Amino acid sequence: MYKRQLTEAGLLPGEDVHKHLTGCGQAILLAVTLGPGVDAQIRRAGVGDIAAGVASDALGSALAEQAADAAEAQLRQWAATAEKYLTGRFSPGYGDWDIAVQPLVAAALDTARKAGLCVTDTNLMTPRKSVTALLGVSDHPVKGQLAGCGHCVLRTRCEYRKRGKTCASE
């Protein structure tokens, strides 16, 4: 999609996502999900064994990120053959890109019909082990806005960082 179309559709509120797309005339939205079976397995693992539930949840998160990495790798192969350049992934909830855009991202990708991926009234995805993201597309090399703690508006009061972790590792 063209960056202008995403902006007009209300998908790009906030400054951080615009910084991420600096130099990009287009962007790609992506969504991946491990499906409802993984959510069910995590629940079953946690019955009577909290540690197994926590471990299963962490494994599911890691697998969802690996699925997103695989999707991104396919997009990078396409970009190389099309002589295009991509930024890294930037997901709703990064920086000031409000998680409230999640329903708009899901609607733009028609995730409910195509992948069974829905968004709750509180902007959480179901199945839980799912990832949505945006990558900028350009005709020249671009870096995009770096994601992570150094650029997060919550970095000074983040509960994850207080425990020596990051939200990406949860």
Identify the role of each PLM range:
Residues 6-22:
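Active-site cofactor/substrate anionic-group-binding motifs, chiefly glycine-
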